[in-house]
Amino acid sequence: MHIARFCLLSSMAVLALSAGYVSGAVIEIPDEILDSARFISLYSDGLRQKRQLNLSGPGSEHAGTIRLDGQRNIFDNGRTRVDGTGSYQLDYARGMKPIHGAGLGAEVNHNIWRGRGGQSLDLYGGATRQFNFGNRPNEWGAHGGIRYNF
């Protein structure tokens, strides 16, 4: 069990260093978190990824969050682009069960106008679905608008 904890802490440190973000220090990780390490290690390669690791110390009851975000281009014909997104989040605190969450989403961008100097005017819209496994309700989100790039 000590080897598994060491491996998990080492992988968390690598995630944190690659993200450039660490807060506080890890003192103890509940055993339930070790079960989640398998999912994190299976997270697919080839995505544009953002990793965030937030670990806090004794002042906040050994609480923290591990979040992985990925984005992949699904379709692109030069004027219309569709990107898919996915995320996994693990919230934990000493004395409580970890809360897992996953999200899926898509965004569509359509170019309306393109200038000679590289400017562009785009319409965009997207939706996300957050699945929370625990006591929190699932959530929907939507966004859209006009984007001018200069």
Curated annotation (Swiss-Prot):
* Organism of derivation: Riptortus clavatus (Bean bug)
Instruction: Tell me the compartments it is located in.
Output: Secreted
**Keywords for the protein's UniProt record, in alphabetical order:** Antibiotic, Antimicrobial, Immunity, Innate immunity, Secreted, Signal
This chain's protein is named: Probable antibacterial peptide
Q: Which GO terms describe its cellular component?
A: extracellular region
Purpose: Has antibacterial activity in vitro.
Q: Which GO terms describe its biological process?
A: defense response to bacterium; innate immune response
Q: Which residues form the signal peptide?
A: 1-19
